[in-house]
Amino acid sequence: MDLEKLHDPSLIKSMTKQELEQLAEEIRQFLIEKLSITGGHLGPNLGVVELTLALHSLFDSPKDKLIWDVGHQAYVHKILTGRAGQFDQLRQYKGLCGFPKRDESEHDVWETGHSSTSLSAAMGMATARDLKGTDENVIAIIGDGALTGGMALEALNHIGHEQKDLIVVLNDNEMSIAPNVGALHNVLGRLRTAGKYQKAKEDLEMLIKKIPAFGGKLAQAAERVKDSLKYLLVSGIFFEEMGFTYLGPVDGHDLDDLMENLKYAKKTKGPVLIHVLTKKGKGYAPAENDEKGTWHGVGHYKIESGELVKKPAPPSYSGVFAETLKKIARNDPRIVALTAAMPGGTKLDQFAKEFPDRMFDVGIAEQHATTMAGGLATQGLKPVFAVYSTFLQRGYDQVVHDICRQNLNVFFAIDRAGLVGADGETHQGVFDIAYLRHLPNMKILMPKDENELQHMVYTAIQYEGGPIAVRYPRGNGYGIKMDEVLKEIPIGSWEVLQEGTDACILTFGTMIPVAEQASKELSQQGYSIRLINARSVKPLDEAMLHEIAKSGRPVLTLEETAVQGSFGSAVLEFFHDHGYHNVVTQRMGIPDRFIEHGSVSELLEEIGLTSSQVANQLSKLLPRKQKRA
């Protein structure tokens, strides 16, 4: 059928099983074709086609609330709710968002992007329903990877205690982005092979009834036998003990099995957890056979061969970080690395190949990773926690309370710092400077290129004065020559890239090329601009700031971070605190709003951070030049 005609999920409710199976095949082909051009989260969505069809067949969205954890697996939901015609612009500037978006559709009742939030949101909605006296169903769909997150476990505990009518669909594909780790993953592994829980439970109850319960010690012994049998024979007891009715495992690609269990859950009082087994990448062989997470989120690819289309490019910043860390670790046994379920994205999977005993993937658990790093540091090791800027937010209290307060030697390698593009507002790494720079003991650096990055990694390893963060962007470097010998960069020192007499631009990282081009444009108007690589965001280069302030030149601070509370604010604070009240200073950075999806270049133009926009802004601070005769 024409998927663009699916303007409402009610249209599939009257379909036969055969028609739904045909629709599932058409949706898979649609996704494979569309995402081969736009890129996106292919593997997760191919795995939930039948599950999404079953949910929309049995429940009445948007009255019934479907909450997608992380949200990257909601493409099928978007197709069924009238958005198939927008997939040519998936994750493109001003196009269809890759995650649920409340202002995009009434069927997107909760926005996600980070993991492990759905159960808490579902608990809130179920509680509100009961307080208002309405009767809608609340269903949270969460993956086995996201279920390892501490917030999800906190919510399970609360939901089970309160006994709210709420359905949790556990989408178990044995992977999140990378293969899952941890004890809970092992519990789910045993459940996958345990057979149907409800049948086992009924058989067990029959067996227990045959155990006599007569007086005294014999009665106590009988109860112990009953408990032992229960734990021995019924694998679903983990969730039952949390207060849930457990259903499953259910074949996530069998519509009959899905429908039967969803119907049972719908009429069951109290919280229900349906354990659904799915195959990530179902229906497309390259994605089905992916064991590393390559097909979780992809760019352009060739459908026939499954070849990912990548243009030749210099090494990525993540790759340079990991290679440098390996190089140093060969001679420094103190170095250990941590990741929170992102070994591939951070490139620590390469570190793990060489140092498997010194690399720790803790799962989706940034809080735990941060404090574990602190524990390692107290014992004389040098822990390196590689984490995306947007995900470090999840471990903020631990950064404050456990690391900075104790002044522990933990190295935070902050990946994806700055705008990240297509993943949009939930993933832009623009807040870390603002939330880190005011913390006592924290140091923050950012390199201008990949060569400076390797020196900063070395500097951070050698630093013994407490916590230090080196932030670096998504994407590739510039292909410049890399120094063979690593050296320390003095913390608190800046670099003069270009001398000038009319104004000064203070910038760092990805904004340096923008500033260089802006200064060229201004030079054509007769202006001479001084350009500073402010690579040490904290501490500032106070000696240079004194000299700049005394020169009397206008100052422009330029950063690809939230302008409020970040680097520019620090410079203004310095001028104010030292009595330089006459220094004309202009801040430029990310405005006070969340930045949506699009290419980085499109987003920079939208928020006013292109070279011509920077040049125009700085020119307003400068006296007009007299035209030469």
From Swiss-Prot:
UniProt KW Ribonucleoprotein keyword: no
Cofactor annotation remark: Binds 1 Mg(2+) ion per subunit. Binds 1 thiamine pyrophosphate per subunit.
Reactions catalysed, as given in the entry: D-glyceraldehyde 3-phosphate + pyruvate + H(+) = 1-deoxy-D-xylulose 5-phosphate + CO2
GO MF annotation terms: 1-deoxy-D-xylulose-5-phosphate synthase activity; magnesium ion binding; thiamine pyrophosphate binding
InterPro entries, sorted: Dxylulose-5-P_synthase, THDP-binding, Transketo_C/PFOR_II, Transketolase-like_Pyr-bd, Transketolase_BS, Transketolase_C, Transketolase_CS
Family: Belongs to the transketolase family. DXPS subfamily.
The protein's assembly and partners: Homodimer.
Name of the protein this chain belongs to: 1-deoxy-D-xylulose-5-phosphate synthase
Organism: Halalkalibacterium halodurans (strain ATCC BAA-125 / DSM 18197 / FERM 7344 / JCM 9153 / C-125) (Bacillus halodurans)
